[in-house]
Amino acid sequence: MSDLRGLLFRLYKRLSTFRRAKLTIGVRALVLDEENRICLVRHSYRDGWYLPGGGVKTGESLVDAMQRELREETGVELPETPQSVHGVFSSFREHKSDHIVVFVVKDWSISSSVSPEIAEVAFFASDDLPDGTSAATTRRIKAVSYTHLRA
């Protein structure tokens, strides 16, 4: 009986590793202009408005990933100074294990063109977001509004 238990336990352990969601780490940037409006992007391949960002590549730091994604999606370049981290958020929808680090960016300039994957880049007041803003984006903006958008 103990042999059967051991076999079942080992089988359970192996199968449970296949059930586990792959951990992914991504970055999003809440870029503010001089009027505290928020930069949002609309992708060419999906509906809705989102904070710019994306996945962190193997060997890439969080800051480097944020800088790369901002450059690709918005043309925004950042100075050498560190940016503010607002928080780390998790999503376990659709059997995923996504973890997103949200940065607040106030010091930036435009210096490059936008990737063809981006249909539109625009700035919006936090209380006047466009129709189609994703629920997660809206939640992040509300959370940041309490700490970073106060004059």
Indicate residue ranges for each PLM-predicted region:
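Conserved Nudix-box catalytic region and its N-terminal flanking loop in Nudix hydrolases
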Residues: 33-73
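A short coil-to-beta-strand element that immediately follows conserved catalytic motifs
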Residues: 77-87
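Active-site-adjacent beta-strand/loop module that shapes the phosphate/pyrophosphate-binding cleft
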Residues: 88-112
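NUDIX/MutT-family hydrolases
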Residues: 104, 113-145
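Conserved small/polar residues in nucleotide/adenosyl-binding loops
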Residues: 147-151
